[in-house]
């Protein structure tokens, strides 16, 4: 991991973690090392040597601004090749076509439109409650080259609003989505 206070990468925590795995009978084939910065060749060699894997089997799981960049990052570091070699499939595997991944990233960096959707739910304060719904809206936005901004609205906050206050709350929304749920709380 990258230690910000020291301003450098430290390999010892990874070495110790792999040692514990080996004590439990688990031998790593590949190391995916979480890091904010890329691993240098020296760090890869050192980790490979002390963790009993090849330097090519040490891959940085870099922090990225967009989750859809991860396959491209792993490909750039050769993880796909290492996996194919491990399973004896490298010689017969076709060259990967990453065009769609590049298109997704390009679309997300250059949306042509923007839309705001209100999601009215009972548990909007819990971050992962509507995760699949959020991702579905993001995917729909990518398909339409449109950035989807979601306004999370707790359903109970709407119960006692006047019609005018409700209209003001909904002003600026291109659409409203009410996820399915159980019970009547907040949805009447």
State each model region's role:
Residues 1-188:
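N-terminal beta1-alpha1 cap of cysteine-dependent amidohydrolase-like domains
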